[in-house]
Amino acid sequence: MVKKTVLTGDRPTGKLHLGHYFGSLINRINLQSKKDSDNNYEYDQYIMIADMQALTDNAEYSSKITNSVAELILDYYSVGLISLDPTKSQSIVFIQSKISALSELSMYYMNLVTESRVLRNPTVKSEREQKKWQGGSVPFGFLAYPISQAADITAFKADLVPVGEDQLPMIELTNEIVDKFNNTYHPVLRRTTALTTSDAKLSRLLGIDGEQKMSKSLNNAIFLSDSEQELKSKVNKMKTCTRTSLNQPGTLEGNTVFYFFDVMSVWLNMYHPHHYILQELPKWKARYVNGGQNNEEYAKDSFLKDKLFDLINELLIPIRQKRQEGLEHISSIYKKIDFDTKKANIIANTTLHELKCAMGLDYPNF
């Protein structure tokens, strides 16, 4: 069975949080570990640290990007996407700016896409309008980033690209570029397929405010690197409902604590299907909705928040431990990233050479 290639990645703009974990990291961990009936790994997974793309709206803050790359590498190590043990399943993690072929591919692709087509991308369109509304302007690099993403995908001839619903137009544009190039020159490039999560709740995790998508900039995120004290404080800030008495019926809708219980239940079903909370949670919900009787402990908000803290902390404890281990072996991890980046460079340069040959740009050495 021929392995399929997966390309995914993150913009290094800060530490990763639970939104990243449930929205993409779990999927990556599963993909890199998946084996076929012959016990062979099914996928070669490439994870790109998209530092060049991060600069499209952070050009004045390049030091922020540099620092965030280091944080991102530690986060990847802490969840098992990077390993110093060659016998363990892991992904190929590389830094975008070190793959020079990507910039050259982007330049060629720009000649195959019209301005109006790029501006039809809903993400580009909405961001452009938002910047205008704020009295600012959008860098051309931001407008052109879907073409850069097409270069990333095609350089590694990715069969699958995990994306959220909002990134589907990017896959569509990539395949349009592939078709245009193959029809204009020679069939060198490969069409790709979007791999989307089936659970909308996981792909757009709400923050601790229960209202907006989890984000560092909105100050509503639970980071994978949060200490127990930080986590405890954030869980205690979560809203429940407006009941004034324990005996009054509570509501689940808009209740951030129960929202996170439901999210964490997805993790439990994946990795701890016999966890006691999976059995107890329906009872807690029923008592909460019906109103606690005789001051039942598990109908109290404080009890529920304590249990939620314990559950999220159970997820984060091994991640924190691996992160500390990563700090102690950071030089070896950086060497691993350098090795992976060189490997990625070879693949991208091979694709670039094929593309230039198809275009007639494979000039002899003068």
Specify the residue positions occupied by each region the protein language model found.
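N-terminal Rossmann-like or analogous alpha/beta NTP/dinucleotide-binding catalytic cores
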Residues: 2-150, 268, 314, 320, ...
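Short coil/turn segments at secondary-structure junctions
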Residues: 12, 56, 60, 161, ...
